[in-house]
Amino acid sequence: MIERTPVLDAVTHAVLISGLLLLLMPLWIVFVAASHDFQTVNQVPMPLWPGNHLLENLSLAWERGNFDRVMLNSLIVAVGVTVGKIVIAALSAFSIVYFSYRLRMVIFWMIFITLMLPLEVRIVPTYAVAADALRPFQATLDVLGIPLDLPEWNLLNTYSGLILPLIATATGTFLYRQFFLTVPDELTEAAKMDGAGPIRFFLEVLMPLSKTNMAALATIMFVWSWNQYLWPLLVVTDHQNFATATMQLQKIVPGPAFGEPPIWNVAMAANLIVLAPPVLVTILLQRWFVRGLISTDK
């Protein structure tokens, strides 16, 4: 039983408000810096109240960073990775839960263990595969002594190279597996009696039931893929056509090597531009996101 007293309520609200202020303070500083001119931003201390140059700085940041192109690239990559993760996670969890075969739990735990292997750890072999996606198959053919030369498939500087290496997800597989385990067995038996095969059961029964779970996973993965920096920086050398929004931020803050001081007001405006899409997605899917994580009704 949870006690409700005026003192505990006051302490709880004080803790929550303090945490909210600590979370919002960096965002407020970014917003304030993006609304001032160059001279005001470089004052010590910098004013903590917004100025009247926000639209000017946003326009300059958009033009300087070529955001009309890179925002589209980031959107393509984020949507592609999100859809790929949802499809791969749902299919793998469906196989593990609804099909009985040897080593299925071993396969699940092998997938789950990859949570301890972030992209930074496997960056070198992943890049090697992206440089020639058919090289592992060619090596297998060579070991088996099959005289077949596969063509080179280079994924660098392509949307495929930005998306495909990121679509595997242990988190999504785990979430879908836990959801599928809560689906009543009677529903599966009823689908079998109605003549539904595995694919039809998956598409017409499980997928509609997992809408909230899908929305929660989509929110997490969209924000994660939108904020990717290391992998696009490594796999993209054609910055004019395939650079993403997070990569473009480095060009907004020129250093001494560029012959001019950092323009922090424009850089902060660029951060607001890059921050807007994931914030908008999170706000729009917030209710579905919470329901997908805590809802147990089917």
Residue ranges and their predicted role:
Residues 2, 8-298:
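A structural signal for multi-pass alpha-helical bundles of membrane permease subunits
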